[in-house]
Amino acid sequence: MMERFEKIEMKIPAKAEYVAIIRLTMAGVANRMGFAYDDIEDMKIAISEACTNIVQHAYKEDVGEIAIVFGLYEDRLEIMVADNGVSFDFNNLRSKVGPYDISKPVEHLPENGLGLYLINTLMDDIQIMHDEGMTVLMTKYIQREQVENDGNPISTYNSY
């Protein structure tokens, strides 16, 4: 039996000024699902990096679209970010991304690949497919125990 989920789809122009719309939509969806604040902030960075890669690399001179699909499951949020532009070898670049030498000055860090490193670090799972364009599937699991253990109950009871 297939796992039940809700799906939200969006398409926006692949322009930097529209990335905030995707980020805010994702934050609203994640908040509604019960994600912790820190996890939402992590996902905002990851989705921004995935979309910025498309804006910078996918369409060259042309303006294309970014397709975003949110899969809302009981225990996780799956985020698919896709384009139909020119692919670069994401997996090859990803394999070159590793721990950064913190003893080196920030000016010596590699310029390309930091976004991939961030996505990989901030999300629970990431899958990359490239054929005609690029598709990045990112997954973040809801840490309900953290909310239950760390959350302070709010009461309207007046104790004085």
UniProtKB/Swiss-Prot annotation:
Keyword Oxidoreductase: no
Record keyword Transferase present: yes
Domain of life, source organism: Bacteria
Keywords in alphabetical order: ATP-binding, Kinase, Nucleotide-binding, Serine/threonine-protein kinase, Transferase
InterPro entries linked to this entry: Anti-sigma-factor_SerPK (IPR050267), HATPase_C_sf (IPR036890), RsbW (IPR010193)
Disulphide-bridged cysteine pairs: none
Catalyzed reactions per annotation: L-seryl-[protein] + ATP = O-phospho-L-seryl-[protein] + ADP + H(+); L-threonyl-[protein] + ATP = O-phospho-L-threonyl-[protein] + ADP + H(+)
Pfam families membership: HATPase_c_2 (PF13581)
EC number: 2.7.11.1
Single GO molecular function: protein serine kinase activity
NCBIfam families, sorted: PRK04069.1, rsbW_low_gc
PANTHER family cross-referenced by the UniProt entry: ANTI-SIGMA-F FACTOR RSBW-RELATED, SERINE-PROTEIN KINASE RSBW
HAMAP family with a match to the protein in the record: Anti_sigma_B
Function: Negative regulator of sigma-B activity. Phosphorylates and inactivates its specific antagonist protein, RsbV. Upon phosphorylation of RsbV, RsbW is released and binds to sigma-B, thereby blocking its ability to form an RNA polymerase holoenzyme (E-sigma-B).
Family per record: Belongs to the anti-sigma-factor family.
Protein name: Serine-protein kinase RsbW
Native source species: Bacillus cereus (strain Q1)
Encoding gene, per UniProt annotation: rsbW
